């Protein structure tokens, strides 16, 4: 996996976040069109262009500058098949190159251009967090487990630190 990340971010890359998603029949959700806009950090430090601040699961998060978000790469490792019936990711290709969108701008995007990302068990999907994406609820009994890892290649500015780095 490191080779994949280095090919995009260079040899100085490191992991900054990991999330486990487990869509099942009993733990099922739909996610509206959005961009991933926050990073997790160790402590609150005022940096121009960073904010608003939130806490999720006891971890401090902030919306960083567009430059920081543009430098992050996500790899989604699929532990189960992600088929049409178990809530696959849908994306709008190229949208990550256009910056950060307001809710109104997102609602005006041509969803007819969406691509459904079916991924086989053991496969990976690579994306930028700023890519417009959504997912539907699972309509079958089987799970859709995904390990979502985010990578960066630069430290944060002015004394702000990533919450975790590997």
Where in this protein do the model-derived segments appear?
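Glycine- and charge-enriched low-complexity intrinsically disordered segments
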Residues: 164-166
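Non-heme Fe(II) oxygenase catalytic core, chiefly the N-lobe of the double-stranded beta-helix
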Residues: 1-121, 134-142, 149-161
């Amino acid at each position: 996996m490191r080779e994949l990340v280095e090919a995009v971010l260079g040899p100085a890359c490191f992991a900054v976040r990991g999330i486990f998603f487990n869509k099942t029949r009993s733990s099922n959700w739909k996610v509206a069109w959005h961009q991933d806009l926050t990073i997790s950090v160790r402590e609150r430090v005022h940096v121009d262009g960073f904010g608003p601040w939130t806490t999720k699961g006891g971890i401090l998060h902030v919306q960083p500058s567009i430059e920081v978000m543009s430098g992050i790469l996500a790899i989604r490792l699929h532990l189960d098949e992600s088929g049409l019936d178990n809530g696959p990711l849908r994306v709008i290709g190229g949208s990550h190159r256009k910056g950060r969108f307001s809710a109104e701008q997102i609602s005006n995007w041509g969803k007819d251009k969406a691509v459904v990302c079916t991924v086989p068990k053991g496969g990976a999907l690579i994306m930028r967090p700023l890519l417009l994406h959504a997912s539907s609820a699972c309509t079958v009994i089987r799970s859709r487990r995904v390990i979502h890892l985010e990578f960066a290649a630069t430290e944060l500015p002015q004394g702000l630190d990533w919450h975790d780095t590997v």
